[in-house]
Amino acid sequence: MMAEEQKVLTVNIVTPDGVVYDHHASMLVVPAMAGQLGIMANHEPIITPLEIGEIRVKRTDNPGHEDAIAITGGFMEVSHNIASIVADGAERARDINLSRAQRAKQRAEDAIKTASEKHDSDELRRAQIALQRAMNRIDVKNHLQ
């Protein structure tokens, strides 16, 4: 006998520093490599890599509210109504320090300029990723406001 289909998805986000997020959701949107991917309860099992971007979670305990989380890449596994996200880094929008993110953006822009002048392709790539991460944090924080 089959149990009634659930309409709740558990979303867990973990980084090397520990659990960043753990809530029930009606829907989850993640920045997959192939584009934005929406996940709801009873989704087929899937494992997918994630890019630097914003995760959006529509929570079941507050239907009008959507949580935003900035991630710096990782992967997601969905199985049995649990979405487990393992990310290199993740920060909830409410926890992002905007001035710190803006300083990181400025440092990355300066590093891009220096690396370009030195023709240092490795340093340039690292600086471009740092800029992408800083811009993502700024965008996610601004999305909250």
From Swiss-Prot:
<dbReference type="GO" id="GO:0005886">
    <property type="term" value="C:plasma membrane"/>
</dbReference>
<dbReference type="InterPro" id="IPR036794">
    <property type="entry name" value="ATP_F1_dsu/esu_C_sf"/>
</dbReference>
<feature type="compositionally biased region" description="Basic and acidic residues">
    <location>
        <begin position="106"/>
        <end position="123"/>
    </location>
</feature>
<dbReference type="Pfam" id="PF00401">
    <property type="entry name" value="ATP-synt_DE"/>
</dbReference>
<comment type="similarity">
    <text>Belongs to the ATPase epsilon chain family.</text>
</comment>
<feature type="region of interest" description="Disordered">
    <location>
        <begin position="100"/>
        <end position="123"/>
    </location>
</feature>
<dbReference type="Pfam" id="PF02823">
    <property type="entry name" value="ATP-synt_DE_N"/>
</dbReference>
<dbReference type="InterPro" id="IPR036771">
    <property type="entry name" value="ATPsynth_dsu/esu_N"/>
</dbReference>
<dbReference type="InterPro" id="IPR020546">
    <property type="entry name" value="ATP_synth_F1_dsu/esu_N"/>
</dbReference>
<dbReference type="InterPro" id="IPR020547">
    <property type="entry name" value="ATP_synth_F1_esu_C"/>
</dbReference>
<keyword id="KW-0066">ATP synthesis</keyword>
<keyword id="KW-0139">CF(1)</keyword>
<keyword id="KW-0813">Transport</keyword>
<comment type="function">
    <text>Produces ATP from ADP in the presence of a proton gradient across the membrane.</text>
</comment>
<keyword id="KW-0472">Membrane</keyword>
<keyword id="KW-0375">Hydrogen ion transport</keyword>
<dbReference type="GO" id="GO:0045259">
    <property type="term" value="C:proton-transporting ATP synthase complex"/>
</dbReference>
<comment type="subunit">
    <text>F-type ATPases have 2 components, CF(1) - the catalytic core - and CF(0) - the membrane proton channel. CF(1) has five subunits: alpha(3), beta(3), gamma(1), delta(1), epsilon(1). CF(0) has three main subunits: a, b and c.</text>
</comment>
<protein>
    <recommendedName>
        <fullName>ATP synthase epsilon chain</fullName>
    </recommendedName>
</protein>
<dbReference type="InterPro" id="IPR001469">
    <property type="entry name" value="ATP_synth_F1_dsu/esu"/>
</dbReference>
<dbReference type="GO" id="GO:0005524">
    <property type="term" value="F:ATP binding"/>
</dbReference>
<keyword id="KW-0406">Ion transport</keyword>
<keyword id="KW-1003">Cell membrane</keyword>
<dbReference type="GO" id="GO:0046933">
    <property type="term" value="F:proton-transporting ATP synthase activity, rotational mechanism"/>
</dbReference>
